[in-house]
Amino acid sequence: MNGTANPLLDREEHCLRLGESFEKRPRASFHTIRYDFKPASIDTSCEGELQVGKGDEVTITLPHIPGSTPPMTVFKGNKRPYQKDCVLIINHDTGEYVLEKLSSSIQVKKTRAEGSSKIQARMEQQPTRPPQTSQPPPPPPPMPFRAPTKPPVGPKTSPLKDNPSPEPQLDDIKRELRAEVDIIEQMSSSSGSSSSDSESSSGSDDDSSSSGGEDNGPASPPQPSHQQPYNSRPAVANGTSRPQGSNQLMNTLRNDLQLSESGSDSDD
């Protein structure tokens, strides 16, 4: 002891127990292993493999972290027996101190030889971890193009509902035409009767004037009267021109009435 206290040991007294390696027929053996070089890529969470061959030749195979090259490291060496060396095992969970006797000391060196088939199969069964790279994340995929949505089309209305049926309008036109025809016929009949009355009255006036002139002697020359042309021309106008215009208008209205009736029949 160099005088420096081991942090794993305290200054209290503990009960020391001899392990199974001190029995007459030991059920366990303990060895020490020394490596000349141990790579940092060795996976300490996985189990390795130790093989003892002929002539105390020892081969140790330790796996590497997944994704490393090579996938494992192989160590080879030999062992030498120990005579008086022991190892102290301290269980910090139970506080128990156990002393075990060392059987041999193994010293190995790193080689380039491949490991055993068991380690190789175990490495192949383990899922490989993808290598971590510092590549930037891929850009997001482009958004798909969407056509602009059309506004909803309102319910279509039938033209028959929007435009009312023309039959009521035709009926109204027929009534108006018939009323006009009746009015014109009444006007023409009244104008004919008035013209005949005026002609008969004018004839009786002429007869009375002629008979009065014969009785009273020679009559003075007739003075021009403004009523005679006024009375005669309206008679002519009422007797001839007025009925002709009314007849033409009646014919036109009748034709229109027939056309409207024929049109309504064709629509039906």
UniProtKB/Swiss-Prot annotation:
Compartments (UniProt record): Nucleus speckle; Nucleus, Cajal body
Biased amino acid composition, Basic and acidic residues: 171-181
Location of the region described as Necessary for transactivation activity in the Swiss-Prot/TrEMBL record: 182-262
Keywords assigned by UniProt, alphabetized: Activator, Nucleus, Phosphoprotein, Transcription, Transcription regulation
Segments for region (Disordered): 106-268
GO molecular-function terms, A-Z: transcription elongation factor activity
Expression (tissue specificity): Strongly expressed in heart, brain, placenta, lung, liver, skeletal muscle, kidney, pancreas, spleen, prostate, testis, small intestine and colon. Poorly expressed in thymus.
Residue list for modification Phosphoserine: S165
Primary location: nucleus
Pfam families for this protein: EAF (PF09816)
Sequence ranges of Polar residues compositional bias: 238-268
Family to which this protein belongs: Belongs to the EAF family.
Protein name: ELL-associated factor 1
Originating species: Homo sapiens
